[in-house]
Amino acid sequence: MRPLARLTIAALGALAMTGCATTNISSFVERGSDVRQYRTYSWGPANVQTTGDPRLDNNRFFQERVEAAVERNLHARGFEKATEAPDLLIRYYASVEQQVNANGADRPYVACEDCRPFVFDAGTIVVDLIDARTRRLVWRGWAEGSIDGVIDNQAWMEKRVDEAVARILERLPRGMGRAS
């Protein structure tokens, strides 16, 4: 194989791995909540809080992707969308902030002549499930990770949103959404 071909394959592999950068997924259930009682949902009031990032604020493409991914995953878990008297209200929030990685700074005893800090975009998506009757938060799940180069590319963003939402909602408690 020619050196240029090897270099191209290596660069594409590195690019692909960047797209699959580590995403941290977390969730919690409100204590005392009987999560098995919830079967239907509807979208709660629109989130009016802005992120300060024009790539997300008032971005209908992004909003539609998040909402479609949430609905698809909830439906797969047995939830039904309700037009009247839902059990749950769904809300989400997304943010992007620039973070700095001081490459090698986390290993103070390792000599590194070529360690340089670099700035990257870190994204967070939070999905809240709220009891529609009491208006109390029942469950929250979120994903955090590098989205460098993703947020400015619609196809990549759609893929990462789908993956993040699926992984967030995988953490719903057993029995939530399914008929007993």
Write out the residue ranges for each language-model feature.
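A structural "domain/chain start" motif
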Residues: 2-3, 7, 20-69, 76, ...
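Bacterial Sec-type N-terminal signal peptides, specifically the leucine/valine-rich hydrophobic h-region
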Residues: 14-17
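C-terminal/domain-edge helix-coil "capping" segments
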Residues: 21-36, 120-124, 131-180
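Surface-exposed short loop/turn segments
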Residues: 23-24, 77, 87-138
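Extracytoplasmic/periplasmic, Sec-exported soluble proteins
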Residues: 35, 54, 58-66, 82, ...
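Solvent-exposed loop/turn segments at secondary-structure junctions
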Residues: 48-50, 95-99, 134, 144-148
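Sec/Tat-exported extracytoplasmic proteins
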Residues: 66, 70-81, 94, 129, ...
